[in-house]
Swiss-Prot record:
Subcellular location: Cell inner membrane
GO cellular component, one term: plasma membrane
GO MF annotations, alphabetized: flavin adenine dinucleotide binding; FMN binding; glycerol-3-phosphate dehydrogenase (quinone) activity
Function (record text): Conversion of glycerol 3-phosphate to dihydroxyacetone. Uses fumarate or nitrate as electron acceptor.
Alphabetical list of CDD domains matching this protein: GlpA-like_Fer2_BFD-like
Originating organism: Escherichia coli (strain K12)
Keywords: Cell inner membrane, Cell membrane, FAD, Flavoprotein, Membrane, Oxidoreductase
Similarity remark: Belongs to the FAD-dependent glycerol-3-phosphate dehydrogenase family.
Functional pathway: Polyol metabolism; glycerol degradation via glycerol kinase pathway; glycerone phosphate from sn-glycerol 3-phosphate (anaerobic route): step 1/1
Protein name, per record: Anaerobic glycerol-3-phosphate dehydrogenase subunit A
Pfam families recorded: DAO, Fer2_BFD
Record gene name: glpA
Substrates-to-products reaction catalysed: a quinone + sn-glycerol 3-phosphate = dihydroxyacetone phosphate + a quinol
């Protein structure tokens, strides 16, 4: 195993989720030398395994007022700085005949106290503005919920950090902390792509590894007791609702239906798991049954809608001994300066919170870093737009009128005002790779050159290749070939990554493999194993 020379910086950030990316951006904007390390790819943990809900905070207004206030504040900020990552759909909190209608008044009052707009509307009006909603509802409250693409949001933060000098090291796993007495002064990492090991040095190390933060802290003989609460979700094969639909009750299983991009999602469950199971993301048959049964109460059309796939994530909550479900644990932010808490200088942990509050978490963590380094520059991330969100989509679209509307519309939707810099009338930009999501070869090239793509799975998270109805059946082989063409992979690596990609898609289909989903999977297997010649031993489960 080779060892590379060490690198030095002002701060090392462990974790490539939204929070880690936000910290990298904030630190870089304040003039710090930044290195971020992530063992897999960006947004592969809890960041990429949630609803993608742009919380208004209403969901937490009754049970967690502090989190509710944080959510509505960040909701308004993200609508300004990340406009190409969010969709302000608005949301409905509905009361069904089996629910307590008197809770609605409590809910509205709690929202108002948290600064959240909450308007009670007539059930008939709710049915008009959201045809998918259960027509049996007896009450409805309109709130400023929305949706956010977590992959796009994380990638935009990473891109801005890189453009301000940050070094982003994906596929680099932390194998230990470097200490000098009672001070952490760096990390040891292993590059999964090359097998090389390396020492990285900095006066401050930030642990932003989410639920895996407990494991990172153990390298310093510290204990952060996390509460692993698994949440599972289902993806519909098309977008069945235009508003976020919530149950107007205290948070419970399967009580949010979220429209996102071309699909809708129903979730979540909440199940306490052992810490040694946090990398096991399998969705059980029981969870699927709960999600379907409860989801149909929100939108009866779900009963006739094909389920595309299932997935789950683990919430990075700080543990409480008296709550077996995790529902009553605060979603609030936890910032630990280990110099004050444990007498270990140079080490900070940021955890808790949620995707919605990633920017605020990053601000808190960066403030702590700057205090240690004597940096007095203020945070500007609440005011500076992310790359892609400098101008409205309508303005950008007028700059790329020469291409067919579906192609330019999808490109601008995903990349915002960065699109005109790479979109052209050339053959690459008219060559479709993924019909479901209207991804062109030109967009693949842009992602490879600018968005830190090392594999086919990385490309999926940057462009939505393989995330549509066919689940990679028609586009995965094209995308794999393009990665070789653009010098990301060799031919052998492309074949290996194609197998890995299809198996990852199958993991999400397997829990709901009946009817159309099973037939589609069998056809995919026939296409790649029979027609394209991928051998059984290469394809594992498929």
């Amino acid at each position: 195993m080779k060892t590379r020379d060490s690198q030095s910086s002002d701060v090392i950030i462990i974790g490539g989720g939204a929070t880690g990316a936000g910290i990298a951006r904030d630190c870089a904007l304040r003039g710090l030398r930044v290195i971020l390390v992530e063992r897999h790819d960006i947004a592969t943990g809890a960041t990429g395994r949630n609803h993608g809900l742009l919380h208004s905070g209403a969901r937490y207004a009754v049970t967690d007022a502090e989190s509710a206030r944080e959510c509505i504040s960040e909701n308004q900020i993200l609508k300004r700085i990340a406009r190409h990552c969010v969709e302000p759909t608005n949301g409905l909190f509905i009361t069904l005949p089996e629910d307590d209608l008197s809770f609605q008044a409590t809910f509205i009052r709690a929202c108002e106290e948290a600064g959240i707009s909450a308007e009670a509307i007539d059930p008939q009006q709710a049915r008009i503005i959201e045809p998918a909603v259960n027509p049996a509802l007896i009450g409805a409250v309109k709130v400023p919920d929305g949706t956010v693409d977590p992959f796009r949001l994380t990638a935009a933060n990473m891109l801005d950090a890189k453009e301000h000098g940050a070094v982003i090291l994906t596929a680099h796993e932390v194998t230990g902390l470097i200490r000098e007495g009672a001070t952490v002064c760096g990390v040891r990492v292993r590059n999964h792509l090359t097998g090389e090991t390396q020492a990285l040095h900095a006066p401050v190390v930030v642990n932003a590894a989410g639920i895996w933060g407990q494991h990172i802290a153990e390298y310093a003989d510290l204990r952060i007791r996390m509460f692993p609460a698994k949440g599972s979700l289902l993806i519909m094969d098309h977008r069945i609702n235009q508003h976020v639909i919530n149950r107007c009750r205290k948070p419970s299983d399967a009580d949010i239906l979220v429209p996102g991009d071309t699909i809708s999602l129903i979730g979540t469950t909440s199940l306490r798991i052992d810490y040694n199971e946090i990398d096991d993301n399998r969705v059980t048959a029981e969870e699927v049954d709960i999600l379907l049964r409860e989801g149909e109460k929100l939108a009866p059309v779900m009963a006739k809608t094909r389920i595309l796939r299932a997935y789950s994530g683990v919430r990075p909550l700080v543990a409480s001994d008296d709550d077996p479900s995790g529902r009553n644990v605060s979603r609030g932010i936890v910032l630990l300066d280990h110099a004050e808490r444990d007498g270990l200088d140079g080490f900070i942990t940021i955890t808790g919170g949620k995707l919605m509050t990633y920017r605020l978490m990053a601000e808190w963590a960066t403030d702590a870093v700057c205090r240690k380094l004597g940096n007095t520059r203020p945070c500007t991330t609440a005011d500076l737009a992310l790359p892609g969100s400098q101008e409205p989509a309508e303005v950008t679209l007028r700059k790329v009128i020469s291409l067919p509307a579906p192609l330019r519309g999808s490109a601008v939707y995903r990349h915002g005002d960065r699109t005109p810099a790479w979109l052209s009338e050339g053959r690459l930009h008219r060559s479709l790779v993924c019909e479901c999501e209207a991804v062109t070869a030109g967009e693949v090239q842009y992602a490879v050159e600018n968005l830190n793509v090392n594999s086919l799975l990385d490309l999926r998270r940057r462009t939505r290749v393989g995330m549509g109805t066919c689940q990679g059946e028609l586009c995965a082989c094209r995308a794999a070939g393009l990665l070789q063409r653009f010098n990301v992979t060799t031919s052998a690596q492309s074949i290996e990554q194609l197998s890995t990609f299809l198996n990852e898609r199958w993991k999400g289909v397997q829990p709901i493999a009946w009817g159309d989903a099973l037939r589609e999977s069998e056809f995919t297997r026939w296409v790649y194993q029979g027609l394209c010649g991928l051998e059984k031993e290469q394809k594992d489960a498929l």
